[in-house]
Regions:
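Recognition helix of helix-turn-helix DNA-binding domains
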Residues: 168-203
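Two-component/phosphorelay signaling modules centered on CheY-like receiver
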Residues: 15-35
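Acidic, metal-coordinating helix/loop segments flanking the phosphotransfer/catalytic sites
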Residues: 36-54
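Active-site residues of response regulator receiver
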Residues: 58, 86
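Short amphipathic alpha-helix used as the core "switch/output" element in two-component signaling
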Residues: 45, 67-79
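Acidic catalytic/metal-coordinating carboxylates
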Residues: 39, 64-68
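Receiver (REC) domain active-site loop signature in two-component systems and cognate sites
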Residues: 61
Length: 215
């Protein structure tokens, strides 16, 4: 069944937290339908039936197997951004989540308004990580070999999107220029940030522009 209204999938097996998060997201984003899942299997079914615009994912649901479940959901719906929402706030867990393809990491301890802003950032195509959980060593600057190798993995379409981002164009304008949906552009932006190892659109644009000027 097709739905015209965009949707956010909340996948968490703790009913009280899931209900509280659903209320937060519903109040912050009334234009989105809220879909719920309480296991890896039900999350897969929801991805297939609801085609959500974002997944807020608990790694410890039944059937997840931790990061293995994140990887399988990432493979199942590669165009859908997935944000891990977790009570485990260690930097190593954050790093592993991003390495496995998460578009963000949201601690369950964050205040309500901060969670809403984190969701907004990810829906806009950014990668969200709280400042205090970011690695202290700056990553993915333009002259960093990791940044260059990440840039080399971008698809031709992702490079076009990045070039238009450098030109200062919004997702809406990029979608018009490339004759694709805005949701497709957001998925490309999330993939670009993930591959370049950066956490914001601005960081991607500045670093890529510097690298391209020096090449």
């Amino acid at each position: 069944m097709e739905h015209s209204q965009p949707a956010i999938l909340i996948a968490d097996d703790h009913p009280l937290f899931r209900d509280a998060l659903a209320q937060m997201v519903s109040e912050g984003f009334p234009e989105y339908r809220i879909i719920e899942a309480d296991s890896h299997a039900s999350a897969v079914r929801a991805l297939d039936s609801a085609d959500p615009d974002l997944v807020l994912l608990d790694l410890n649901m039944p059937g997840m197997g931790g990061f293995a479940g994140l990887l399988s959901l990432r493979d199942h719906a590669p165009a859908t951004p997935i944000a891990v929402i977790s009570a485990d706030e260690t930097v190593s867990v954050v790093r592993q989540a991003l390495t496995c393809g998460a578009s963000g990491f949201i601690p369950k301890s964050m205040p309500k308004d901060h969670i809403v802003e984190a969701v907004r950032a990810i829906l806009d195509g950014d990668t969200f990580v709280p400042f205090d959980l970011r690695e202290s060593r700056p990553r993915a600057v333009a002259d960093d070999p990791e940044f260059a190798s990440g840039y080399a993995t971008l698809t031709p379409q992702q490079r076009k999107v990045l070039e238009l981002m450098i030109d200062g164009k919004s997702n809406k304008v990029i979608a018009y220029d490339l004759e694709v949906t805005e949701r497709t552009v957001k998925a490309h932006v999330s993939a670009i940030l993930r591959k370049l190892g950066v956490t914001s659109r601005t960081q991607a644009v500045l670093s890529a522009a510097k690298m391209l000027r020096s090449s």
